[in-house]
């Protein structure tokens, strides 16, 4: 098991699923449900922003399926976390570079741990500013 990102042809998730109609429909549904009360904060830095400035991070891939060549997006709402693109990249770097998070934790546990660490680091940076 590995939580590290895969590159190139080995990653059907990034190359196909994230470009699929199923993912765009699921993403739109998540944002519709979560922006009913207004703008959203980035889960890492806490800055409130709009849908077009956020990406969704998968805490778990259980809802991502491919059946007879067709992608399906059955993620629970709590499997997805809204992040600025830069914060999303930092989160993946924390997971990729930590051997324990990358190889010895579930995807959900690794994501949650890395997100907490990122929140603390970004809070420290904001407090110092």
Q: Which residues make up each language-model segment?
A:
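Histidine-centered nuclease catalytic patch
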Residues: 43-81, 95-102
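Alpha-helical architecture
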Residues: 55-56, 86, 90
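A detector for short metal-coordination/catalytic motifs
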Residues: 78-79, 89-90, 94-129
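Short, charged surface segments at domain edges that flank catalytic/cofactor-binding sites
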Residues: 2-44, 66, 71-74
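A sequence-composition feature that detects small, non-aromatic residues
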Residues: 22-25, 36-39, 43-44, 73, ...
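Residue-level marker of positions within ordered structural domains that often coincide
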Residues: 35, 47, 89
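Intrinsic-disorder/low-complexity peptide segments enriched for small residues
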Residues: 7, 16, 38, 52, ...
